[in-house]
Swiss-Prot record:
Physiological role: Nucleotidase that shows phosphatase activity on nucleoside 5'-monophosphates.
Name of the protein in question: 5'-nucleotidase SurE
Species this protein is from: Neisseria gonorrhoeae (strain ATCC 700825 / FA 1090)
Cofactor binding description: Binds 1 divalent metal cation per subunit.
Top EC category: hydrolase
HAMAP family, per database record: SurE
Length: 248
């Protein structure tokens, strides 16, 4: 089985090295990742310049584009390689709740799903670098189970690994997305020339970490797996919307 791996932290990130190393024990792996950190770019594609595919000394390929670009390049530009499955990650930091809408890690998996492939995004609920051993041990468990009977149809799964010691992981839970308050305040500043500039502020506090949510269960020490879908249609609102826009 051929597995394409990407991320949004860049091809030099620790997480993608771990994911590639473990996945290589189960499948034929190729890595195509951004040449630099592209966190938070969501599903954006590069349309204002051509893309270049280069190979690093460790064998990984990297692209001067976004995670979504990397999936397109990995699908159509790699010599003698057609992916059957796509893994994205391991992201340095969680991708849960509303944050999945901004995540380049989740976006890479989403693009693969749209192309008709099973896709899994992996993230570690920690940005300090202290729990990579937990992530690696969790991956061995997750991928051993995945490859026993790989999905035969496209799926889109978002996996988050807790920030606990390896021996303290409590198991796996299937969850729904939680929510957070969006309090991304603008932080004003000045550049060295004295010109006004702005930074996007920190994310808001989590507002829904109830039992059964990714925020709640991952925070309690569980590996969370959340099945995602692409269809954004608000089906319960169809009738109300039709009534509002009725013009006869």
């Amino acid at each position: 089985m051929n597995v394409l791996i990407s991320n949004d932290d860049g091809y030099l990130a620790e997480g993608i090295a771990i994911l590639a190393r473990v996945a290589s024990e189960f499948a034929n792996v190729r890595v195509v990742a951004p040449e630099r950190d592209r966190s938070g770019v969501s599903n954006s594609v590069t349309l204002d310049r051509p893309l270049q595919l280069k190979q690093a000394q460790n064998g990984f390929y990297y692209v001067n584009g976004t995670p979504t670009d990397c999936i397109h390049v990995g699908q159509f530009a790699l010599p003698d390689f057609k992916p059957d499955v796509v893994f994205s990650g391991i992201n340095r930091g969680a991708n849960m709740g509303d944050d999945t809408l901004y995540s380049g890690t989740v976006a890479a998996a989403t693009e693969a799903y749209l192309m008709g492939m099973p896709a899994v995004a992996f993230s570690l609920n920690d940005a300090s670098g202290r729990y990579w051993a937990t992530a690696e041990k969790a991956l061995w468990t997750l991928l051993a189970h995945f490859f026993k009977k790989p999905p035969s149809a496209p799926v889109l799964w978002n996996v988050n690994i807790p920030a606990v010691a390896p021996e303290d992981v409590r198991g796996i839970k299937i969850t729904r997305l939680g929510r957070r308050h969006h309090e991304q305040n603008i932080v004003p500043s000045r550049n060295p020339r004295g010109e006004q500039i702005y930074w996007i502020g920190p994310v808001g506090e989590v507002s829904d970490r109830e039992e059964g949510t990714d925020f709640g269960e991952c925070g309690a020490g569980f590996i969370t797996v959340t099945p995602l879908q692409i269809d954004l249609t608000a089906y319960p609102d169809m009738a109300e919307t039709a009534a509002f826009w009725h013009t006869d």
